[in-house]
């Protein structure tokens, strides 16, 4: 099961739909994308509460930069928190986590939040249209995601409409140039793939 979210399991509808896939499961809370904060990310308590509300038997912090791919296989589910999608994708590739994440998406439950969701799709290139500076210190040239689904997403849609100049126009331009349809996800929304 693959669950792509804008800001986590933040609505009752998402919690209710996710519960059957998380009940009794041991979950890894992957902090890698939260560059500079990681285990101190302010959203960790909320994500932990949400996973436990879905019946998870336990939630443990996990960092691709510090732990092994084999370690991830010990979990039934994982939630990749938001942060820097360029850094997260680079870390997944550098440390060999692509295959364990693929396996988890088919044998267990894999949840992506914002950047954590973007890396699971075919491409993170849409971020270049809005915040390319996030790639400044990473220098990622290949924006190909893990392609665990065949859709691309645009998280935090309604929030970013007022934050970025010509946001919708730029999103449509990306769609035209790349021949894709972006699934616009507002906070509190999710895509369930494989349900």
Locations of regions flagged by a protein language model:
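Active-site-adjacent pocket-lining segments in enzyme domains
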Residues: 80, 89-109, 116-195
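Structural detector of well-ordered beta-strand residues that form the stable sheet scaffold
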Residues: 3, 111-112
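Short histidine/acidic/glycine/proline-rich micro-motifs that form metal-
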Residues: 33-38, 85, 157-161
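Detector for Asparagine
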Residues: 7, 40-43, 84, 135, ...
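Bulky hydrophobic/aromatic packing residues
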Residues: 35, 43, 50, 56, ...
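N-terminal beta1-alpha1 cap of cysteine-dependent amidohydrolase-like domains
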Residues: 1-77, 81
């Amino acid at each position: 099961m693959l669950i792509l979210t804008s800001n986590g399991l933040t609505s009752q509808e998402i919690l209710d739909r996710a519960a059957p896939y998380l009940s009794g499961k041991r979950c890894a809370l992957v902090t890698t994308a939260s560059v500079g904060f990681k285990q101190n990310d302010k959203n960790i308590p909320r994500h932990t509460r949400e996973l436990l509300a879905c019946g998870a038997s336990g939630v443990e912090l996990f960092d691709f930069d510090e732990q092994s791919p084999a370690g991830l296989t010990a979990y039934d589910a994982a939630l990749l928190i938001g942060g820097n999608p360029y850094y997260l994708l680079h870390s997944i590739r550098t440390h060999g986590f692509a295959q364990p994440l693929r396996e988890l998406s088919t044998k267990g439950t894999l949840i992506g939040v914002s950047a954590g969701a973007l890396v699971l799709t075919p491409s993170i290139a849409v971020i270049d249209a809005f915040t390319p500076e996030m790639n400044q210190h990473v220098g990622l040239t290949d924006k190909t995601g893990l392609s665990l689904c065949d859709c691309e997403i645009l998280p935090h849609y309604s929030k970013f409409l007022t934050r970025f100049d010509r946001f919708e126009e730029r999103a449509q331009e990306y769609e035209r140039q790349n021949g894709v349809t972006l699934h616009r996800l507002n906070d509190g929304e999710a895509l369930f793939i494989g349900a």
